Curated annotation (Swiss-Prot):
The lineage of its organism: Bacteria, Bacillati, Actinomycetota, Actinomycetes, Kitasatosporales. The modification N6-(pyridoxal phosphate)lysine is found at K229. It comes from Streptomyces coelicolor (strain ATCC BAA-471 / A3(2) / M145). GO terms for cellular component: cytoplasm; cytosol. The gene is glyA. The keyword RNA-binding does not apply. This is Serine hydroxymethyltransferase. One of its GO terms (biological process) is tetrahydrofolate metabolic process. Pathway: One-carbon metabolism; tetrahydrofolate interconversion; Amino-acid biosynthesis; glycine biosynthesis; glycine from L-serine: step 1/1.
Length: 420
């Protein structure tokens, strides 16, 4: 048999075994990392299609390679769907990731040395919003803003810093923040100082698509997002912008940042955008929010407080909960490991003014999108929230909690058709 037509399990059993093991891990544990989700089988089929073979530098109708007539159709479908989904004038669906979408947007709007403002990483921002060792911190003069004592973005500080430093770009967005941002207020500040407003909605784009979170598109000059978090599609990025900025954005992506787009991923994005426009998706996003609120409410009860556990801002408006462990006997790493032990995957996360190192931290970021995609109901979320609360106590029964997790995982089978 030609190697071209040899199945993975025959051609490379080592890689196949690792893939099978990962499938088993996803099926048998509860995924609660806020930035992770489960892509529909149709999305994975598109991403694993023959489109992976095609080079297509350029844009639909304007390629530097022949034979692009079919990938042109696919990419235009993706563009049209995401524009309709968010009400955008322009969309570029080629960025390979959210970080590259942010980089391209900044390249389109800025020159090296220009001043930008973004939420401080330790207060919930993202690497690409101005971290010193990231491209954004190296190429631009970064003025970070912060959360106040209540754990929410201090808009008075944003306005003051903007007037003092006159940034060319203000970034509104986050990677670990449990509340909604006031996009109109950000735009007002941006207009007052002559800055562009860029919103990074990577985490909450699915909620926006479902009409359960304010849409930043009417307020921002540019909006970036990933396609795999709450949107639940393939791993990739998208840039939305005004029509006025379309040419700058496209040029910054290609040839500015990337060469050939990954058209198999673009196809998967197109499928994900169709899913995101469905009633099923909207219902799922509702359960995502409900699950996060149930979790937050469980972790502010007296028994959790007695264990030194608290919830930043006292609750959540989005798909994640930030747990503060500064008064607990556990640090973030230990808490992550303990939940992993019982079958729940989360990630340690810094809290504002965290006294511990970044690889240890004093907090956890816990999200509900993947479990909502899996079919979890309010009753299921109440059960998993109780398991988490019990696991974070000084004394816990690991075996009993593992059994409860297994019951939940078995109740909601994941990708049963993929089992060999």
């Amino acid at each position: 048999m030609s190697l071209l037509n040899t199945p993975l399990h025959e051609l490379d059993p080592d890689v196949a075994a690792a893939v099978d093991a990962e499938l088993d891990r996803q099926q048998s544990t509860l995924e609660m990392i806020a930035s992770e989700n489960f892509a529909p089988v149709a999305v994975m089929e598109a991403q694993g299609s023959v489109l992976t073979n095609k080079y297509a530098e350029g844009y639909p109708g304007r390629r530097y390679y022949g034979g692009c007539e079919h990938v042109d159709v696919v990419e235009q479908i993706a563009i049209d769907r995401v524009k309709a989904l968010f009400g955008a004038e322009h969309a570029n669906v080629q960025p390979h990731s959210g970080a590259q979408a942010n980089a391209a947007a900044m390249f389109a709007l800025l020159k090296p040395g220009d001043t930008i403002m973004g939420l401080n990483l330790a207060h919930g921002g993202h690497l690409t919003h101005g971290m010193k060792i990231n491209f954004s911190g190296k190429l631009y003069n970064v003025v970070p803003y912060h959360v106040g004592d209540d754990g929410q973005v201090d808009m008075a500080e944003v306005e003051r810093l903007a007037k003092e430093t006159k940034p060319k770009l203000i970034v509104a967005g986050w990677s670990a923040y449990p509340r909604q941002l006031d996009f109109a207020a950000f735009r007002k500040v941006a207009d007052e100082v002559g800055a562009y407003l860029m919103v990074d909605m990577a985490h909450f784009a699915g909620l926006v698509a479902a009409g359960l979170h304010p849409n930043p598109v009417p307020h921002a000059h540019v909006v970036t997002t990933t396609t795999h978090k709450t949107l639940g599609g393939p791993r990739g990025g998208v840039i939305l912008s005004t029509a006025e900025l379309a040419k700058k954005i496209n040029s910054a992506v290609f040839p500015g940042q990337q060469g050939g787009p990954l058209e198999h991923v673009v196809a998967a994005k197109a499928v994900a955008f169709k899913v995101a426009a469905s009633e099923d998706f909207k219902e799922r996003q509702g359960r995502t929010l409900e699950g996060a609120r149930i979790l937050a409410e469980r972790l502010v009860r007296d028994d959790a407080k007695a264990a030194g556990v608290s919830v930043l801002t006292g609750g959540t408006d989005v798909h994640l909960v930030l747990v503060d462990l500064r008064d607990s006997e556990l640090d973030g790493q230990q808490a992550e490991d303990r939940l992993h032990e019982v079958g729940i995957t989360v990630n340690r996360n810094a809290v504002p003014n965290d006294p511990r190192p970044p690889m240890v931290t004093s907090g956890l970021r816990i999200g509900t999108p993947a479990l909502a995609t899996r079919g979890f109901t309010a009753e299921d979320f109440a059960e998993v929230a109780d398991v988490i609360a019990e696991a974070l106590k000084p004394s816990y029964d690991a075996e009993a909690l593992k059994a409860r997790v297994k019951t939940l995982a078995d109740k909601h089978p994941l990708y049963p058709g993929l089992n060999k």
